């Protein structure tokens, strides 16, 4: 009881008895990553007492891993694939396969920036002014290489947190910190001197896993669905009814992926129109559609877009 017969046919890939080991970033990206997987079709359920969330897919096993360490574990083969930032791939110099870019973060669907920050009244105006200075950052390896490539000698020390405060309190001359908008930095009386790195989330995989045809196929399927979920966040669907004699005027307003779908209604003088548009365009587009003669306008969110 409870076991499949020897010749049972299953719908899962041949490697189902050895599931893919997927790393979910623990910490600031955790909630956003689980939400992205949910939109893509996978329900991941974390547990308070361990680091191994449940997932409703027998071909995958999950582990919560710090984003800073993810690339190292994927490179070793401890994990087959995982999600982490480009910044931590570069920091660890891990040899991994980058499957796809997924531009999302804890608070938005845009990249983050590692920036050089100094107190507002600091004499440092450019990166070259860092010669002989003391810099605090969590991204030590990358920062040292960045400066070395430009022939700048400076002391770079690891920061365990509250990095911005070190610059405010005068403990260091500058910090290299991550930000999405820069608002917190400015609120602390600090000034951004330069952007050092634009970073976003990457789905990475172990080279051995990618060399296996079945595992590679499954990894690429996961990537496809995650990208489809992210793409859908930027778009909405619009449906409306349009008088036949005003169709051309309405269609001219639509920045569609392709030509909009137009179908006939029972009343031959009216047509139904459906299209996909940028979510940010709707606030201006709907009033324009109304003015052009469209009626019964409906807007609805998309879950995936391939």
Predicted feature descriptions by range:
Residues 11-59, 64, 84-113, 121-306:
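Small-molecule-sensing regulatory modules
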Residues 59-80:
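Short, structured active-site "lid" loops
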């Amino acid at each position: 009881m409870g076991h499949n017969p020897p010749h049972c046919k299953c719908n899962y890939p041949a490697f189902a008895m050895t599931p893919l080991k997927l790393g979910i970033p623990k910490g600031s990206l955790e909630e956003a990553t689980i939400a992205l997987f949910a939109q893509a079709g996978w329900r991941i359920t974390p547990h308070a007492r361990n680091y191994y969330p449940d997932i409703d897919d027998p071909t995958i096993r999950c582990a919560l891993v710090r984003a800073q360490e993810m690339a190292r574990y994927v490179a070793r083969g401890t994990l087959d694939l995982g999600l982490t930032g480009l910044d931590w791939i570069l920091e660890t110099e891990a040899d991994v396969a980058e499957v796809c870019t997924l531009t999302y973060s804890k608070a938005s669907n845009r990249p983050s920036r590692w920036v050089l920050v100094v107190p507002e009244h600091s004499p440092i105006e450019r990166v070259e002014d860092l010669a002989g200075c003391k810099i605090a950052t969590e991204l030590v390896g990358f920062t040292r290489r960045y400066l070395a490539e430009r022939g700048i000698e400076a002391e770079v020390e690891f920061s365990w947190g509250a990095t911005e405060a070190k610059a405010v309190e005068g403990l260091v001359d500058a910090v290299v910190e991550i930000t999405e908008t820069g608002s917190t930095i400015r609120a602390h009386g600090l000034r951004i001197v330069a952007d050092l790195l634009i970073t976003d989330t990457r789905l990475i995989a172990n080279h051995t896993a990618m060399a296996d045809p079945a595992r590679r196929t499954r990894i690429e399927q996961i990537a496809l669905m995650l990208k489809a979920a992210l793409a859908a966040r930027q778009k909405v669907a619009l449906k409306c009814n349009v008088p036949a004699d005003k169709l051309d005027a309405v269609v001219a307003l639509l920045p569609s992926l392709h030509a909009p779908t137009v179908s006939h209604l029972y009343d031959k003088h009216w047509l139904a129109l459906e299209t996909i548009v940028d979510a940010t365009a709707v606030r201006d587009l709907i009033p324009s559609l109304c003015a052009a003669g469209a009626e019964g306008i409906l807007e609805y969110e998309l879950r995936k877009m391939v």
